[in-house]
Structure formats: C-alpha cells, structure tokens
Amino acid sequence: MTSLSTLQAPSQSTNVSYGAVRAFYGHHKCATGWITRIFREMSFHLGRRHAIVHLPRHISPYASLADKVSAESIDVLIYTNAQIHEVQTLPEGSRGFHVVRDPRDVLVSAYFSHKHSHPSDKWPELEPHRDLLQTLSLEDGLAAEMVFSQSVFADMQAWDYKQPNVLELHMETLTADPDAGFQRIATFLGWLDPEALYSFAYRVQVRLNRLHYLGHARVPGPYPLLPVPRRPLATLPPDTLAHILEASRFNRLTGGRSRGEEDVQSHYRKGTPGDWRNHFTPALVDHFKAEWGDLLIQLGYETDHTWGLI
C-alpha cells in the first residue's frame, strides 16, 4: 500500500527545486486576473509556494526579483506587470509563459476598467486619473488613457520574445480555447504528463494540498483553520486541471453572462477580441499608429501601418 510519504506519479519525481521557478508573466489588462486565478489554483493543488508581484514596490525591498524569489523560497511566480530586466535575473532553469494582447484592446479595456471598476484602494495613483476620465468624452478619454497606460505598452515593447524558456502566447488564442492553452502551458512547465497513471494516494495528496491553502486563507498565519499537510508534487492529473478550468469559465465568473455581453461595471467587461473597432475614431487610429504602430507589428497583430477601422 502506497503511503502519503512515498507517493508519486509514474516516471515523475516529487522533488521540487526552490531555485528555479515556474512563472506567469503578464501585463495589465491582458487577462491577468483570469490567468492568475487559474495558475494559482494549479500551484495550490501541486502544493507549491507561490507569490504575486504586481508592482516594482513589491520587489524593491530586495536588490532584484531573483533575490525576492530566493529570500521568500518562491516556487511559483505570478508577475502581472512583467519587466524583462527583472525576469532576466531569475535563476537558470526557470520556465514560464508570457501573455500579450492586442494593445488597442488593452487601451479600451484599461479605459473602461480605470473609469468604472478597477479597485483603487491599493493603487491611489488611479484616483485622479479616474476623476479625469469622468470629465472627458470617449475619444479624449481614450487619448488620456494612452498616456496613463504608456508603461504597459513600453514593457511589452521591451520584452525579449526569443527566450527558449518562455512560452509566448496571445491572450486571444488562450481565451478562445482555454483547455488547449492551459494544457500546453502545463506541459511546457513540466506540470502535465498525459501518460501518467495516478494512484489514489497521489490524488488524495492533491486534494490535501488544496485544503492546506484553504485553511491558511481562512485563518492567515502559522495556525490555519485546517492544519492539513502540504507536499510539493511534480505533476497535475489532467482531470484536476479540467476541473480548475471549468470553474473559471467566463459565464461562471460573470454570473451567467455570455462572452460578448458587455457590463462596463464588471472586471470581466466583455471578453471579445477586436472590441477596439467599436470605440476608436479615425483620429485615434492615427494617434495610436504614431505612438504604438510598431508595437502592433512586433506582436504580430498587424503587418504594416495601413490598418484602419474597416
């Protein structure tokens, strides 16, 4: 009989190194909240120690992102406003996936989010910008948003898209088929082995790992509500991943609203690629081309500067 202290998936080691990390690299308004929800659940079930880094001030107590990872024994990193110079400090052997979105849709999504729904309690700089957006027309508001979100576009432009240890993805592809997308991600990270046969004991530990984090969430600190042991595991059973993805469908997160149905007050406003065409004007097209036209080509959303509203 397999004991919980010796359980493993076939052909997989349960040893987890806290040197090299597994990471999600994102950018503001590129489905970072949705991806974080799923990726964090994956790490919970695997019993991995994770950390979410949103802003430079979350790194600044340390000399670099690598120093933070080492000091806090981070195994899974969620870096939602990723900057390449910090990523390049991470230990050799780290692997991650990087998600970008059509910058024009980023702009529109940021405009509506910053005007209506994005929390500002931990982002006080948003408040004066939100007040400004309330006074502007849609066209002028989008122009103002282009200035406010400049760093988001700059980070995407500065990124190194040829890193062999980073899987590059378009948000539009990932949201269109989350099952295929996250299976690809999990395989790239070494977290998924479709050929493995998982023992009952292994599956029990997967559930215990999740309960461990649930206990700490309910009662933070050294004495959790549910004192359940956590054990880092190598791979995630495919049906567990499927369950995680099912719980994160757009209609479940929006109370039954279908993708494409707009609610400007919701964090999950619409979920439709190409929505920028419904909000840009010819003047905004010209403005965006002048500022970030090269970025669209760099990311593969356009092949030249001749694009327009049609």
PLM region descriptions:
Residues 49-64, 161, 165-278, 282, ...:
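The conserved 3'-phosphoadenosine-5'-phosphosulfate
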Residues 1-169, 261-263, 269-273, 279-308:
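PAPS-dependent sulfotransferase catalytic domain
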